[in-house]
A protein has these predicted regions:
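An N-terminal, well-structured beta->alpha segment
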Residues: 1-58, 62-63, 137-153
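Gly/Ser/Thr-enriched, mixed-charge loops and adjacent short helices
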Residues: 21, 102-153
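A short, terminal or domain-edge coil/loop segment
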Residues: 16, 88-98, 122-132
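Generic structural "secondary-structure junction" signal
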Residues: 7, 12-16, 99, 106-109, ...
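Ferredoxin-reductase
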Residues: 35-109
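Short charge-dense sequence patches
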Residues: 1-9, 70-76, 102-104, 127-133
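Alpha-helix termini
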Residues: 21-25, 55, 77, 84, ...
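Short, surface-exposed, polar/charged, turn-prone segments marking secondary-structure boundaries
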Residues: 27, 31-33, 67-70, 96, ...
Length: 153
């Protein structure tokens, strides 16, 4: 079974979400959507999420963008952090799907991607991927989780 794309992101069997698949979707997202120069990244607590998140971060940096690593946190906390900062985000999460699966949720600076964004990403996937970028920056932080907790407690 190959990964499925739509409804705000990519979902599939963990075994199908290899580094190349992740890189293709992250690069297509960065080319097709208004990501700016920074993408926030977070993950859920599934055992497969750290490896997938590392592939996401590596690709963000390989396309010359800054990756802000928020580590493990709730999806709404990542969304709040990225929207507040005016940046895009990618959340590694399987949400409610079975444990042998995982996925990516994509956010533009205004919130979750919409159908127009999804169409643009699919079109970008069909174009040759560029590889002539200067390596981007990596920033690790836990401030999003603290801000989220403070806001709601």
């Amino acid at each position: 079974m190959s990964p499925k794309f739509g409804t705000s992101g990519l979902r599939g069997l963990v075994s199908d979400l290899n580094d190349k698949v992740i890189a293709n979707y992250v690069q297509a997202f960065s080319e097709a959507c208004p990501t700016g120069d920074t993408i926030h990244v977070g993950r859920d607590l599934r055992s497969s999420s750290p490896k997938i998140m590392q592939a996401v971060i590596n690709t963000i940096r390989e396309v010359g963008l800054t990756a802000i690593d928020h580590g493990a946190l709730p999806t709404p906390a990542l969304a709040l952090a990225s929207i507040t900062a005016g940046h895009s985000a990618i959340m590694v999460t399987g949400s409610h799907i079975p444990a042998d699966r995982n996925g990516l949720k994509f956010y533009v600076p205004s919130g979750e991607i919409n159908k127009t964004d999804e169409t643009a990403i699919v079109k970008a996937l069909k174009r040759p991927q560029s590889s002539s970028f200067q390596r981007g920056i990596y920033i690790e932080t836990s401030s999003a989780l603290n801000t989220f907790i403070t806001r709601y407690i």
